[in-house]
Regions:
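N-terminal, active-site-proximal structural segment of metallo-dependent hydrolase catalytic domains
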Residues: 1-145
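Metal-dependent phosphoester-hydrolase catalytic domains
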Residues: 4-18, 22-35, 39-56, 62-68, ...
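Active-site beta-strand/loop signature of hydrolases that rely on acidic residues for catalysis
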Residues: 22, 96-102, 116, 120-142, ...
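Structured beta-strand-rich core segments of catalytic domains in phosphoester-bond hydrolases
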Residues: 44, 71-92, 118-121, 130-216, ...
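Acidic/histidine-rich helix-loop elements
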Residues: 100-115, 212-239
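Active-site environment of divalent metal-dependent phosphoester hydrolases
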Residues: 104-108, 138-142, 159-161, 186, ...
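Extracytoplasmic/periplasmic, Sec-exported soluble proteins
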Residues: 112, 116, 155-159, 184, ...
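Short, glycine/charged-enriched secondary-structure capping and boundary segments
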Residues: 112-114, 146-149, 218-219, 276-280, ...
C-alpha cells in the first residue's frame, strides 16, 4: 500500500521534472508560462527524485530505472547546477571582474547591522577587481568612494538616487544604456566599452525584473496558505513575463557589439530558465567553466539559487571564478578572472 502511494507520487514528480527540462526553450510570455515555475524549482525536483531513486534501490524495486532515466535526460541542466571538479587553466590573469547586487547599500535597514555601506566599500576596495559592476547602487547625495579612475554611472529608475554602476581600472571609451524598462522602471542594462591592453571588450551590466516578494510572501515558507501560494505564483508570473521581454532586448543589442562581450549582473532567474538560455547563447558561463559546488548567489530564504552571472565571449579565456559569501546584501558577490 505504502509503496503504491509512493510510486504514484514519484511518477507525478518525475513528470514535473521532465517538464522542467523544457523551461529554457519556452518563452514565459505565452500561455505555457507555468513551465517556467517548474524550471525555477528544478533543483528541488531533482533532489526529491534522487531521494526516490535511493529509496527504490534500498527496496530493490525496478522503479529505480525510471528515475535514473528521467534524471539523466536532464544531464545538461545538472552540469549548470553542480560543479564537482574545479577547472583552472592558468594561475595568471590579465584582468578580473566583479558583479555585485548591493541592495541599495542597506538603505532601508533590511540587515540589522550598522555601517553596511562602509563595509561593502571596504570589501570591494580590498578585492580590487579590474572591473566592478554594481546593481541596485544607491547614491542619494554623493557617490561612494571606490578606488577607480573610470566609471559609468547609469540611472536605474526615475529616482536619481537609484543607479547602476560600472567602475574600471582601464579606460572606458564608449558607454550607453539598453532600454529594457517595464511597468516599474528600476530595471536597466548599461554597457561600457573598455580598452584592456591592445584589445577592447564590451561589458554589459544588467539588473532584470525582480519577483517583488513582500514580507507576507516570505512568511508563506513558515505558514503555507492557499492565498500565500496564489500571491507568490502571480508575482512570479508577472516577473517571468517581464524578463522574457527584457532578455530579447538585451540579446538584440549584444548582437550589434563590435567587441567581445562580458555580460554580468542580477538576472533574477536560474540556469534552468528562458532568461539564462537566451542570454547565454553564444557565450560561456564563468561558474560552469571555472566554478565549484552549487554556486548559490542569492542570500535569502530561498536556498541554492544561482541568479547572478558573469557570461563571456569564447574569445576570452577564463582563469578562475569564485563566489564570496559576504553577508552584506541579499546577494553574494561573484568574481571572474580572465586572460
Amino acid at each position: 500500500m505504502l509503496n503504491g502511494i509512493l510510486y504514484i507520487l514519484n511518477m507525478l514528480l518525475l513528470f514535473a521534472l521532465f517538464l522542467s527540462y523544457a523551461s529554457p526553450y519556452i518563452s514565459p510570455d505565452t500561455f505555457l508560462w507555468p513551465i517556467a515555475l517548474l524550471g525555477l524549482i528544478y533543483p528541488f525536483l531533482l533532489l526529491i527524485n534522487c531521494l526516490f531513486a535511493l529509496y527504490w534501490i534500498i527496496r530493490f524495486k525496478k522503479y529505480v530505472w525510471t528515475n535514473i532515466i528521467i534524471i539523466l535526460l536532464g544531464y545538461a541542466h545538472i552540469k549548470n547546477l553542480i560543479i564537482i571538479q574545479k577547472n583552472q587553466t592558468s594561475t595568471d590573469s590579465q584582468f578580473t571582474i566583479m558583479s555585485y547586487n548591493v541592495r541599495l547599500f542597506n538603505a532601508y535597514d533590511w540587515i540589522n547591522k550598522d555601517n553596511v555601506k562602509e563595509d561593502i566599500i571596504e570589501y570591494v576596495n580590498n578585492e580590487s577587481p579590474s572591473v566592478l559592476c554594481l546593481q541596485e547602487f544607491y547614491a542619494p547625495k554623493e557617490l561612494p568612494k571606490f578606488n577607480y579612475p573610470f566609471s559609468h554611472i547609469g540611472l536605474q529608475n526615475e529616482r536619481k538616487s537609484w543607479r547602476m554602476a560600472t567602475y574600471s581600472k582601464f579606460p572606458v571609451f564608449n558607454k550607453g544604456t539598453v532600454s529594457i524598462s517595464g511597468e516599474r522602471t528600476n530595471n536597466v542594462c548599461i554597457y561600457s566599452d573598455i580598452v584592456i591592453g591592445e584589445d577592447s571588450i564590451r561589458v554589459y551590466n544588467a539588473h532584470l525584473a525582480s519577483n517583488w516578494f513582500q514580507k507576507e510572501d516570505y512568511e508563506f515558507l513558515d505558514r503555507p496558505t492557499v492565498e500565500g501560494a496564489e500571491s507568490i505564483i502571480e508575482r512570479l508570473k508577472v516577473s517571468f513575463f517581464k524578463r522574457a521581454k527584457q532578455v530579447k532586448a538585451i540579446k538584440a543589442h549584444m548582437n550589434t557589439s563590435p567587441n567581445p562581450i562580458i555580460l554580468c549582473g542580477d538576472f533574477n532567474d536560474t540556469p534552468t530558465s528562458f532568461t539564462y538560455k537566451q542570454l547565454s547563447e553564444g557565450l560561456n558561463d564563468s561558474f560552469a567553466n571555472a566554478g565549484l559546488g552549487i554556486g548559490q548567489t542569492y542570500n535569502g530564504k530561498f536556498p541554492a539559487l544561482r541568479i547572478d552571472y558573469i557570461l563571456y565571449s569564447p574569445e576570452l579565456e577564463i582563469v578562475n571564478f569564485k563566489t564570496s559569501e559576504v553577508s552584506l546584501s541579499d546577494h553574494y558577490p561573484i568574481i571572474s578572472a580572465f586572460n
